[in-house]
């Protein structure tokens, strides 16, 4: 049976200017976890003159979810943001495509090192016909230059390319030490800051592996890691597409409610496990949630008079722990990708596990409607959107924040007659207004989302409480079980 080999690759991680740099503060730089934005010119501001409801369906969803100008401005600078790549990443990074092998004339751009063999002489002679004898080579940006048919560690045979990002690249390999099992091998650039960030992620993945020996908590587990001539390499199981990529390829048709319910239950289950082990993911978004198998069937939607893709298996895995933070570690001021960032982070009031709960609420809305709930890239506008959709920000949060420049006499400073103000007024409405139906299960979903989107993190529902919510009463026994046949042991 065909199994999709693509991993996630939303788009590159670049920032358009230092103004929009997000995740790590300068205090984290000395810990090796500061991410650096690429130097790009800011994109043109989107038009604010049209009502959201009057924009044609596909155009509106492109503007509200897939627009590169928005998804690049406030991306998480996690080095693993393209941990599970796909062909989309290669199309969006023309300037970063691999250069061909350098000639001697251009050898000064490359760092060449003689390949070392860890096998015995007899093993080398037996496998010499399979392995390339050429030297290890990096391009000028520190990416490992590799081709299909190359081997790493005399164990991993490269059979395909899955994507490339700021952090490095992901290739599909056959693991000859485990019966030619298929793996996704993440190869980090030979650059100090990315190498150190990879070590931090490996540490988190090792902790998860220790706590989840039975592989039942739905986190992507690391099967192996090694240092290949300065390139940190992490091997993962090969999974399907990420949930955003599938949504995009389905023309942003929302997921059916039963699919939303099953994915929501798995998300709450996985993140409760992390939270119980004093770990906050901090970068939850549809790109970091992968289908185990993204095979689909095509169905005709009579209501919309179009064909839709319906994924056959809604089992998911949570990925990208490059920004995960333990309770005892330093908590940087800014975390989470803009669209999924909670108010306590914007107001710089400190954050903890409830940060992830807010992100899940935003993700569920996106699954349900096909576009993001908060489509913005600026703090003040983001807060105004929150108030339009969820009600007023609690006064005690306003009094505590250092960001008093956003407020005057206890209210947000905002000009509703500006183009931005008119856009927010026309396109943001109370949360329940987005319900597609008034049936009980839709009402229950919106009740769960509203409790996840409480302004005050102390009042926000916990994931242990969320798993008991009536919305999940409609799950089948099979959907409530978490069986795993994975064997990620090294």
Swiss-Prot record:
UniProt xrefs under SMART domains: S_TKc
Principal subcellular localisation of the protein: nucleus
PANTHER family: DUAL SPECIFICITY PROTEIN KINASE CLK3, SERINE/THREONINE-PROTEIN KINASE DOA-RELATED
Tissues expressing this chain: Present at high levels in testis and ovary. In testis, expression is restricted to elongated, maturing spermatozoa. Also present in spleen, brain, lung and liver (at protein level).
Enzyme Commission code: 2.7.12.1
A biological process term (GO) from this entry: regulation of RNA splicing
Official protein name in the record: Dual specificity protein kinase CLK3
Cellular compartments annotated: Nucleus; Cytoplasm; Cytoplasmic vesicle, Secretory vesicle, Acrosome
Domain Protein kinase per the UniProt entry, residue ranges: 156-472
Record key words, sorted: ATP-binding, Cytoplasm, Cytoplasmic vesicle, Kinase, Nucleotide-binding, Nucleus, Phosphoprotein, Serine/threonine-protein kinase, Transferase, Tyrosine-protein kinase
Amino acids binding ATP: 162-170, 186
Active site per database record: 283
Lineage summary: Eukaryota, Metazoa, Chordata, Craniata, Vertebrata
UniProt modified residues of type Phosphoserine: 9, 49, 51, 67, 76, 78, 135
Activation and inhibition: Leucettine L41 inhibits its kinase activity and affects the regulation of alternative splicing mediated by phosphorylation of SR proteins.
Domain of life of the native organism: Eukaryota
Keyword Manganese recorded: no
Biased composition (Basic and acidic residues): 26-56, 63-76
Region Disordered: start-end pairs: 1-138
GO cellular component terms, A-Z: acrosomal vesicle; intermediate filament cytoskeleton; nucleoplasm; nucleus
